[in-house]
Curated annotation (Swiss-Prot):
InterPro entries: NADH-Q_OxRdtase_suN/2, ND/Mrp_TM, Ndh2_N. The lineage of its organism: Eukaryota, Viridiplantae, Streptophyta, Embryophyta, Tracheophyta. Its main location: plastid. NDH is composed of at least 16 different subunits, 5 of which are encoded in the nucleus. It is a multi-pass membrane protein. It is found in: Plastid, Chloroplast thylakoid membrane. GO terms for cellular component: chloroplast thylakoid membrane. Its EC number is 7.1.1.-. It is an enzyme of class 7 (translocase). This is NAD(P)H-quinone oxidoreductase subunit 2 A, chloroplastic. The keyword Magnesium does not apply. NDH shuttles electrons from NAD(P)H:plastoquinone, via FMN and iron-sulfur (Fe-S) centers, to quinones in the photosynthetic chain and possibly in a chloroplast respiratory chain. The immediate electron acceptor for the enzyme in this species is believed to be plastoquinone. Couples the redox reaction to proton translocation, and thus conserves the redox energy in a proton gradient. It comes from Piper cenocladum. The chain crosses the membrane at residues 24-44, 57-77, 99-119, 124-144, 149-169, 183-203, 229-249, 295-315, 323-343, 354-374, 395-415, 418-438, 484-504.
Length: 510
């Protein structure tokens, strides 16, 4: 009899929870319609994989790419709508959040065709790879719109767990296992530090978790200048620092870049930075509104260390992927300038513009590395010597993307850095911008060193990998080359027509 009553209570409680969830989805589902498309795509992937054979592999790629494109389309249709807060204050929809969501979706859309041939050649499990990519994308999108501390913690964990699994996808590779272990340990530690910072913020504000309510709570409790807020700021900066990977929180980055599968590195190198930057701007700008001088100082130190250490250590690298790892550490230093400048002086607009260009430059470079790695089995820089004589198209594409990363005119990277540094200079960050300009010159050196090797490799420099390199024609059915061409075009042409891109970025300011 007692068991029967308990069973009835359990059914009633479960029904209430289900009805509440259905009610929330029914009345608030339109606010997360792009995310719902991805969830539907994930369900379709699972259904097809469990009911079909290996002959339906093209359908898996088609469903993944289509769901991402449809999600982008849904975002574009929602453009310029009034800002809305949904799900009891947990999620916010506005243009600023949506453009970061657009950038994450764009990264994932370009990374899937970049991965097709690599997965086929390495015989990796396809369905799980696509599931992890879409789930990580979903976590990044929720992080961009997160409006309370719980969602800000849960969403990046969704992204991070998939990232750990993707980085260790080649289970038989010792380097991949080592990279995954370091990534997992560092990620777990950073999440713990972040939550500890949130607990100080929660207590100081009188038990508030929504970002704007935290500000009101700090005013009511008169705790906005208390030591507790300073402690919260330090812990949260460290926690976010591990996600953004500026120096000195970059220890995991080179090993993960070198040991993980190259398409995974391409995906993580851009999506993680876009999602973390979106979260950082909201956390620093809203709850720490009264501590702007303190977090500006902390971020300036991180930016200077990142630009100096990242670019100087990149000079000494012999692996292309490790070189790009340290290059990305330097690049995040430039992005932090935009975060510091903030809403005034077009700081966020310059950061968004540079991130858009960085996505194309970085993914284009990784597409070249994937192609070269599949054809030679190496990513050592010296093995690229003389590539122009064997494959002019791949050599020219690599050179254009590297030059754009270095910031040489008239490529997109130059105008992106120019806009970012100009906004920083107008905001009075003279020392920070000067360091950025100096380190940009240093970065041009090691990029040009690789380009020189590509174009003019001497006979004594050419390795057996290059001597055995077979000429490959430009094939329209090669998805990696398609991604590479799109990224190369996006790394060059937008530099000539900057005004429309800047205007769109300026419209995203909240």
């Amino acid at each position: 009899m007692i068991w029967h009553v308990q069973n009835e209570n359990f059914i009633l409680d479960s029904t209430r929870i289900f009805m509440k969830a259905f009610h929330l989805l029914l009345f608030h589902g339109s606010f997360i319609f792009p995310e719902c498309i991805l969830i539907f795509g994930l369900i379709l992937l699972l259904m097809i994989d469990s009911t079909s054979d290996q002959k339906d592999i093209p359908w898996l790629y088609f469903i993944s790419s289509t769901s991402l494109v449809m999600s982008i389309t849904a975002l574009l249709f929602r453009w310029r709508e009034e800002p809305m807060i949904s799900f009891s204050g947990n999620f916010q929809t506005n243009n600023f959040n949506e453009i970061f969501q657009f950038l994450i979706l764009l990264c994932s859309t370009l990374c899937i065709p970049l991965s097709v041939e690599y997965i086929e050649c390495t015989e990796m499990a396809i369905t799980e790879f696509l599931l992890f990519v879409l789930t990580a994308t979903l976590g990044g999108m929720f992080l961009c719109g997160a409006n309370d501390l719980i969602t800000i913690f849960v969403a990046p964990e969704c992204f991070s767990l998939c990232s750990y699994l993707l980085s260790g996808y080649t289970k038989r590779d010792v380097r991949s296992n080592e990279a995954t272990t370091k990534y997992l340990l560092m990620g777990g530690a950073s999440s713990s530090i972040l939550v500890h910072g949130f607990s100080w913020l929660y207590g100081s504000s009188g038990g508030e978790i929504e970002l704007q309510e935290i500000v009101n709570g700090l005013i009511n409790t008169q705790m906005y200048n208390s030591p507790g807020i300073s402690i919260a700021l330090i812990f949260i900066t460290v926690g976010i620092g591990f996600k953004l990977s500026p120096a000195p929180f970059h220890q995991w980055t080179p090993d993960v870049y070198e040991g993980s599968p190259t398409p995974v590195v391409a995906f993580l190198s851009v999506t993680s930075k876009v999602a973390a930057s979106a979260s950082a701007t909201r956390i620093f700008d809203i709850p720490f509104y009264f501590s702007s001088n303190e977090w500006h100082l902390l971020l300036e130190i991180l930016a200077i260390l990142s630009m100096i250490l990242g670019n100087l250590i990149a000079i000494t690298q012999t692996s292309m992927k490790r070189m790009l790892a340290y290059s990305s550490i330097g690049q995040i230093g430039y992005v932090i300038i935009g975060i510091i400048v903030g809403d005034s002086n077009d700081g966020y607009a310059s950061m968004i513009t540079y991130m858009l260009f960085y996505i194309s430059m970085n993914l284009g470079t990784f597409a070249c590395i994937v192609l070269f790695g599949l054809r030679t089995g190496t990513d050592n820089i010296r093995d690229y010597a003389g590539l122009y004589t064997k494959d002019p198209f791949l050599a020219l594409s690599s050179a254009l993307c590297l030059l754009s990363l270095g910031g040489l005119p008239p490529l997109a990277g130059f105008f992106g850095k120019l806009y970012l540094f100009w906004c920083g200079w107008q905001a009075g960050l003279y020392f920070l911008v000067s360091i950025g300009l100096l380190m940009s010159v240093v970065s041009i050196y090691y990029y040009l060193k690789i380009i020189k090797l590509l174009m003019t490799g001497r006979n004594q420099e050419i390795t057996p990998h290059m001597r055995n390199y077979r000429r490959y024609p430009l094939r329209s059915n090669n998805s990696i080359e398609l991604s590479m061409i799109l990224c190369v075009i996006a790394s060059t042409i937008p530099g000539i027509s900057m005004n429309p891109i800047i205007a769109i970025a300026q419209d995203t300011l909240f």
